[in-house]
Regions:
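Paired acidic/hydrophobic, glycine-rich loop segments that form the ligand-binding mouth/hinge
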Residues: 85-94, 212, 229-234, 250-251
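A bilobed periplasmic-binding-protein/Venus flytrap-type ligand-binding module shared by bacterial periplasmic
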Residues: 139-146, 187-189, 261-274, 292-293
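Short beta-strand->loop
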Residues: 110-118, 129-132, 247-259, 268-271
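A ligand-binding cleft/hinge motif common to bilobed small-molecule-binding domains
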Residues: 98-102, 224, 228-248
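Mature extracytoplasmic/periplasmic domains
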Residues: 268-330
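Conserved C-terminal helix/tail region of periplasmic/extracytoplasmic solute-binding proteins
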Residues: 327-360
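Early extracytoplasmic/lumenal segment of secretory-pathway proteins
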Residues: 22-101
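Extracytoplasmic ligand-binding site segments that recognize negatively charged/polar headgroups
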Residues: 42-49, 87-88, 94-224
Length: 360
């Protein structure tokens, strides 16, 4: 019976389309409804709602449907709709930027109908069809009640040294499950290509039986409750927002280098409301949009992210000003990590490290 149930579950997972896994939230038009904008996104609604509200203030006849999914499910749904010539969303906003580049490369987007800001960094756009809206560092979060101030690692070298205390940290380190998280995969892949510490760090995570999670919010919750002492490669936007609610959360901007990711937006080739899709993206790049993104949501903007981060005092650990930020450029180079052979080899190395260490 167990085998039968398991088989049926696998069959159900195979036949259910990715779009069925979406969670839709509707924002009714404040005036007489004349059109609808559908946003496909991975961002937690609470972080992007201020931008949606501002958009509707200037577009009162537009209702908005916010279609939230995990990064890989969103990509699968958009790619499937594109291949079939069907509609899924008017605009797609995702932190899984390699998948976003692939959608553009596969002809699933179209050029913007507005001019990009002249001061937009070169790394933050590609082919006038994909633009980075945010500036989000990959940080280390830790439990201030679980680490003494003098123990807080300032960089990856010190983190590897700290994790030698396996009896103390076993099962109490959290990071992304890179097999199920697009943003987790890109952070890990970039680490492997940029850091001489990657092999030792991966070994340390495995030896400490690091726990794997789908999302930054789950890792942060683990630290906040004391179940985890430390979380690696967490999105700084989520961590900074949660730290304002709970000072128990400490944040580290690694001083050796701090990756910065930009949630990228495109207009779908099969969008039904291309006007509104362009208007929303253009709004995010204005002074008003930057203020909303850099406010309580802490997403920050691709236009002013470094300057805004340098003003932040995390209260402990290396400050943003000490970090060597390395933004991940929106370019075809990101497609290397999606090559099937390279992805398989990378994931095999990941699994092997965790299996040898007994990690989750």
């Amino acid at each position: 019976m167990r085998r039968l149930i398991f088989g049926l579950c696998l069959l159900a997972a195979w036949i259910v389309p990715p779009s069925a896994m979406a969670e839709d939230t509707r924002f009714d038009a404040s005036g007489e409804e004349a059109e609808t904008l559908v946003i496909g996104s991975v961002t937690d609604l609470v972080f992007i709602e201020p931008l949606i509200r501002e958009f509707q203030r200037t577009n009162p006849s537009t209702a908005v449907i916010y279609r939230q999914m995990t990064s890989l499910d969103l990509y699968a749904a958009v790619a499937d709709a594109c291949e079939k010539g069907e509609f899924f969303a008017d605009t797609v906003i995702s932190s899984a930027i390699p998948e976003q580049v692939r959608l553009v490369n596969d002809g699933c987007s179209e050029p913007f109908r507005f001019s990009l800001p002249p001061d937009l960094p070169d790394w933050a756009s590609w082919r006038n069809e994909l633009v980075g809206l945010t500036y989000e560092p990959a940080v280390i979060v830790y439990d201030r009640e679980g680490l003494k101030p003098e123990e807080v690692p300032r960089n990856r070298f010190e983190l590897v040294d700290l994790l030698r205390q396996t009896e103390r940290f076993r099962g109490r380190i959290g990071t992304y499950d890179i097999e199920s998280s697009g943003v987790g995969y890109i952070f890990a892949f970039e680490d492997a290509s940029q850091a001489s510490t990657w092999g030792r760090l991966l070994e340390s995570l495995g030896q400490n039986r690091a726990r794997l999670f789908c999302c930054s919010s789950e890792v942060i919750d683990g630290v906040r409750t004391g179940r985890l002492v430390l979380g690696y490669n967490v999105l700084g936007s989520y961590a900074l927002a949660r730290q304002e609610e709970d000072p128990r959360i400490g944040i580290i901007f690694p001083s050796d280098y701090t990756l910065a990711l930009s949630r990228a937006a495109l207009v779908s080739r099969h969008a039904r409301n291309k006007r509104a899709a362009n208007a929303l993206i253009a709004l995010a790049l204005t002074d008003t949009g930057q203020r909303l993104l850099s406010g309580p949501s802490r997403l920050f903007s691709s236009l002013n992210g470094p300057a805004m981060l340098n003003r932040i005092d995390t209260g402990a650990g290396p400050s943003a000003e000490e970090a060597a930020f390395r933004p991940i450029a929106l370019s075809p180079a990101l497609l290397v990590g999606l090559d099937q052979a390279k992805r398989k080899a990378f994931l095999d190395q990941w699994r092997k490290s965790f299996q040898l260490g007994g990690g989750e």
